[in-house]
């Protein structure tokens, strides 16, 4: 079933071998609510707790590919959610710091990771809009929810050469990649339209 999912992703244009291998290795059904387990290897998003979703595998693969993650990359993830994206990053060999703003999801992820082989360097309950300055700079930052604007703290926390992958927009989002080219300059690229749940700010 995972192999079939990988074949689907390849047909949709995912080419990074490490990303495809991670998707092929990770048991996605473990990250899903029991009512949807039969559909774990379908390329679709499904509901999880707190009105959030586990992202479509294509979206996870595309964001990871755009991040250009390699073994040892220091990555900040904004929105732990189900933990599936976290696991993909970890499987590739990234050092992952992950922030979750929904307390219910944070506790669920915290308990889940204790039982699995996937262990983020740090799992933080907090506001993703402000990033994680104490651990900056990062090789990459990935935002797993739709942001109405690009939070400046996230750009500031990138290393030179680092990438911010963020879906920007209200109803639908444009996948946007900012690459830091100097202390003050960034290169911006866009990669088509996606749909994400909103990135929430400062509420518990």
Predicted regions and their residues:
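Conserved nucleotide-cofactor-binding alpha/beta core module
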Residues: 68-187
């Amino acid at each position: 079933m995972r192999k079939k999912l990988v074949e689907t992703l390849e047909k949709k244009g995912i080419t990074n071998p490490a990303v495809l291998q991670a998707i092929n290795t990770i048991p996605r059904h473990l990250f899903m609510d029991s009512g949807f387990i039969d559909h774990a290897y379908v390329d679709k998003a499904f509901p999880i707790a707190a009105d959030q979703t586990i992202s479509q595998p294509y979206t996870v693969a595309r964001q990871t590919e755009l991040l250009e993650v390699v073994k040892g990359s220091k990555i900040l993830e904004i929105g732990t959610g189900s933990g599936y994206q976290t696991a993909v990053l970890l499987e590739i060999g990234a050092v992952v710091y992950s922030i979750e703003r929904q307390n219910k999801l944070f506790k669920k992820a915290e308990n889940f990771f204790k039982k699995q082989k996937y262990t983020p360097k740090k799992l933080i309950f907090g506001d993703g809009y402000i990033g994680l300055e104490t651990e900056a700079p990062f090789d990459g930052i990935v935002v797993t929810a739709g942001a109405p604007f690009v939070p400046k703290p996230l750009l500031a926390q990138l290393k030179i050469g680092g990438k911010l992958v963020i879906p920007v927009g209200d109803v639908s989002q444009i996948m946007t990649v900012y690459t830091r080219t100097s202390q003050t300059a960034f290169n911006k690229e866009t990669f088509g339209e996606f749909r994400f749940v909103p990135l929430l700010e400062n509420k518990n």
